[in-house]
Amino acid sequence: LIRGKRKITLTEDGIILRKRAEEILSLVEKTESDLISNTPLISGEITIGGNPTITVLNTAARLRSKYPDVHFQFYSSDAIDVLERLEHGSLDFAVFLEPIDVAEYDYLPLPESSCWGLLMPSGCELAKKDYVDKTDLLETPLIFHRRVGLQQLISHWADTAIKDFNIAATYNVINGSPTKFIKSRLGFYLTTEDLLPAVLEPDVCFRPLNPPLEIQYALIWKRTALQSKAAEMFLQELKQSVT
């Protein structure tokens, strides 16, 4: 603890300890829920991290209609935090954009996919084009996700090392609309189209990459995890809906 004149704040180590304590409490609560869900009556809580797709949500609704004592908790955070919680067992599943680390996780491809492109000011020169090519991307200051796997995906598409891109800023999770970044003129926002609002503000526009770069969502879970009966039923229901 750091004691000030009027308040006490946590040190960096204290912040880490608090985060670990929160994870432990979450894991204890989940373990209690799992023990309940392994009774003959299917019940308990299923925890899902990341950005749930409509397929995942529809499956959750169907499972709830069959087993009303099953409940869901959705947890939104950056990829590192979600993977840590998946690793520690406080999450059953996570919804991620591919690529997936298949050495550590089992996964189920989901039908939802999206295309990569740039969010930009409507009045800029690049907005006059129907698409964004490699040359455009390399000449443009970018605001890009910090997840290494996604950066490698773009690097492979452009056949260019990520260090050679003009990356003005990176982010992990965006709260609210990303258009504020465009209006600030910090850079152009490299993202997938499905993460944008259904209706964009008139002074911004989205242009897809060319050649097109589509990416698919997947549900992932820890390969060695011991799943509750409720989680097993959810996964079974989801597999039936996507096959």
List PLM regions with ranges.
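Beta-alpha-beta core module
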Residues: 102-109, 113-115, 176-224
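Short amphipathic alpha-helical coupling segments at ligand-binding clamshell hinges
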Residues: 13, 17-20, 59, 153-154, ...
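Secondary-structure junction motif
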Residues: 140-163, 227-235
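A short LG(V/I)-centered, amphipathic sequence patch enriched
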Residues: 1-10
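Hydrophobic hinge/microswitch elements
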Residues: 78-91, 96-97, 148-205
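Alpha-helical linker/hinge and terminal dimerization helices associated
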Residues: 17-39
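Interdomain hinge and pocket-entrance segments immediately C-terminal to HTH DNA-binding domains
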Residues: 36-55, 66-70, 114-115
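Flexible hinge/capping segments at coil-to-helix
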Residues: 40, 107-116, 120-142, 146
